[in-house]
Regions:
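Rhodanese-like catalytic fold shared by cysteine-dependent sulfurtransferases
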Residues: 2-3, 19-28, 33-37, 47-89, ...
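Short, surface-exposed ligand- or partner-binding patches at beta-edge/loop junctions that are enriched
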Residues: 92-94
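Sec-dependent N-terminal signal peptides
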Residues: 5-15
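Structural scaffold elements adjacent to functional motifs in cytosolic proteins
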Residues: 41-43
């Protein structure tokens, strides 16, 4: 009986830790569609970048990497969970998609959000003549 119980717990533990997170790369039209459904867009760039280019209206500014490339994943997740309905997921946004790809992989590894939508960033947004607003 004990052996069956221990085996059951091991089985449950192993399968409970399998990542159900999903990373999906999306384009600008999909960004707009998902935002219209209430999925938050998290702009992970630095303040100097927001000031320089502007930001997407109704996005959330939460820097991930500082100017030295350092980050605090736990703090970032705590901030994002305050604004995200974890069922719907989050949209990550940076300059070119490079930073958000790294962040998405880190979030997937620990199953922080069920869905992480990765974008091509501000450069692709700008090239498609999409609207930006002044950072305030």
């Amino acid at each position: 009986m004990k052996t069956k119980l221990i085996t059951s717990f091991i089985f449950i533990f192993l399968f409970a830790n399998i990542s159900n997170a999903e990373i999906k790369n999306i384009g600008n039209n999909e960004i707009k569609r998902l935002m219209s459904l209430g999925i938050p867009l998290i702009d992970v760039r630095r303040k100097d970048e927001w000031v320089s280019t502007g930001v997407i209206k109704n996005s959330y500014m939460h820097t991930f990497f500082d100017k030295d490339g350092k980050y605090d994943l736990k703090s970032f997740i705590t901030k994002i969970k305050k604004i995200s309905n974890s069922e719907k997921g989050i949209i990550l946004f940076c300059r070119t998609g490079r930073r958000t790809t790294a962040i998405a992989k880190a979030l997937e590894k620990i199953n922080a959000f069920p869905k992480v939508y990765n974008t091509k960033g501000i450069k692709a947004w700008f090239l498609d003549d999409n609207e930006l607003v002044k950072y305030q």
